Amino acid sequence: MKTFISLIVNFYIIFFSVSISSQNLNDLVLEPGFKISIFADNLDSPRQMAEGKNGTIFVGERNGKVIALIDSDKNGQADSKIIVANNLTYSTGVSLFDGDLYFSEISKIWKIENIEQWISSYNSDSGMPKKILVVDNLPNDKWHGWKWLKHDQDGNLYFNVGAPCNVCLSDNPQFASILKFNNDDLVYVAKGVRNSVGFDFHPLSNQLFFTDNGRDWLGDDSPSCELNRVDFEGQFFGFPFKHASALMDPEFGNMNSGYDFIDPILELGAHVAPTGVSFYNGTMFPKQMQNNLFVALHGSWNRSTKVGYKLIRVEFDEQGNVVNAKDFVSGWLKNEKVSGRPSAPMMKKDGSLLLSDDKANVIYRITYSEQA
């Protein structure tokens, strides 16, 4: 057991040793052969993560910071933290491409060039790295303002703009969509998307898969949250006219939308609140988990009995259709008491899976061994 130590230098860097006792993992249930440990704790509402070529883990925290976590001795626990951006608004999304770190605010997207080079030369006189504005014309409505960022293999940056409401129609077409930033142009990838805060590209087909949070106040069991697949850009996924596979909205369902609605490929359940997702194509986990999608169910907030609060694993056939979905990690919800809220999974280059938790303020590390 390690003892927690902290040292702050110039307010930007913290050295620490993870205290396993700070988070009780005994109640968590995993599939056979898997173990869960703490990669980093004492964080501040961590959400999306991205890994640099040198193994640095970048994290968007909901409190207005983007941090870098460094496991210098490669023991599976972060031992230092550097704040690379602060004083941000709704700072959850992060993505890396070609050595540059991209991160979000509610209405802006920034980047820091050669971020790991800056980290490698960091000292107490470094100050904060220079950030460059990439996108600055997004809506600033706070309702569903959290962003998820993801680059495709060509360097196009994908991000979400959630609906500014529970259910409504807006004159601004950017709302309720997933867009990509391509050569200074904004392209609509998916429309009619109420609030997606998790998407990833299939490792083989490169198709975009995304979750969507269903609307509220239609009862405990309706409508379902969704997992969707984009077959071509510009498809319309129903909001606000239609929810899940078959539920027409009581207010907007009779309107002529002018769109063909695309049904979800998987209904996840009402109010489970899917957030981050990550496809797995590493070598540590069993072979049958190749190209599975891990989906964080953040958990309900307005249901008479709580649901969600777990990480699930979704299997697909060769056509990208869902074959099976099952719990991968559960146990954060017990007797209506919640000990954690899984936020976003991320596969590390070593094949392990990181999982952020913005209630327990930790990042877990999940590993596999046949002897476990």
What kind of feature is each model-predicted range?
Residues 65-68, 100, 108-110, 177-179, ...:
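A short loop-to-beta-strand structural motif that recurs across blades of beta-propeller domains
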Residues 90, 95-97, 107-152, 160-164, ...:
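Asp-box/WD-like beta-propeller blade repeats and closely related beta-sheet repeat scaffolds
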Residues 24-41, 74-87, 115-140, 171-198, ...:
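Blade-edge beta-strand/turn elements of extracellular beta-propeller
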Residues 69-75, 112-125, 231-237, 313-321, ...:
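Short loop/turn segments immediately following beta-strands, especially the blade-tip
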Residues 56-60, 100-103, 156-160, 207-211, ...:
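Conserved beta-propeller blade signature
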Residues 23-30, 146, 163-166, 181, ...:
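Beta-propeller domain segments
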Residues 346-371:
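Blade-level signature of beta-propeller repeat domains, shared across WD40, Kelch, NHL, RCC1
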